[in-house]
């Protein structure tokens, strides 16, 4: 079956429009995910800083494998 040139062009234009919509949707998701990643990185940095502060304040925990005294 030979499709007419006009039909083929219309089909390609339709596919292109759907591809443009898909690319935009994927880009929107990517931007949202990047924001989440950046927020998580900031939270991780804050937690690491807080951990360092606690270690400086209370010292490191020495875990010799012995159960705590209440056992």
Swiss-Prot record:
Superkingdom in the source lineage: Bacteria
Residue ranges of the TM segments: none
A Pfam entry, by short name: SlyX
InterPro entries membership: SlyX
Family indicated by similarity: Belongs to the SlyX family.
Descriptive protein name: Protein SlyX homolog
